[in-house]
Amino acid sequence: DILMTQSQKFLSTSVGDRVSVTCKASQNVGTNVAWYQKKPGQSPKPLMYSASYRYSGVPDRFTGSGSGTDFTLTISNVQSEDLAEYFCQQFNRYPLTFGSGTKLELKRADAAPTVSIFPPS
């Protein structure tokens, strides 16, 4: 089986940033790679096919590149709705195999603050 490795388990970003999600195939898969976006409680949404082609309706801030064994999904001008998990998949050879996923999350400084109220001592 072809192993798809996503070495970045998490990527921290801010709204407006540009981020790159990487994926490496254990053998040459040409450009037979797709990318998916997965949000909690939702089905995976196809983003890219054949490494660099966007599905209809996918914003053009998503771009894909690569061939052979090394692939990248780049998100320019990250929006809050882009905070999700991203998976690569090879369809060069059966069985079709997926990467383990990269979760895009807000940098801690950008996350909403939490307030704790303690009773008087």
Swiss-Prot record:
The keyword Lipoprotein does not apply. PANTHER family: IMMUNOGLOBULIN LIGHT CHAIN. This is Ig kappa chain V region Mem5. Residues 1-104 form the Ig-like V-type domain. GO terms for biological process: adaptive immune response; immune response. Its main location: secreted. Residues 98-107 are annotated as: Framework-4. Residues 1-23 are annotated as: Framework-1. PROSITE patterns: IG_LIKE (PS50835). GO terms for cellular component: extracellular region; immunoglobulin complex. The keyword Phosphoprotein does not apply. Anti-influenza H3N2 neuraminidase antibody. Gene3D superfamilies: Immunoglobulins. Disulfide bonds join 23-88. Residues 35-49 are annotated as: Framework-2. Residues 89-97 are annotated as: Complementarity-determining-3. It comes from Mus musculus. It is found in: Secreted. It comes from the Eukaryota. Residues 24-34 are annotated as: Complementarity-determining-1.
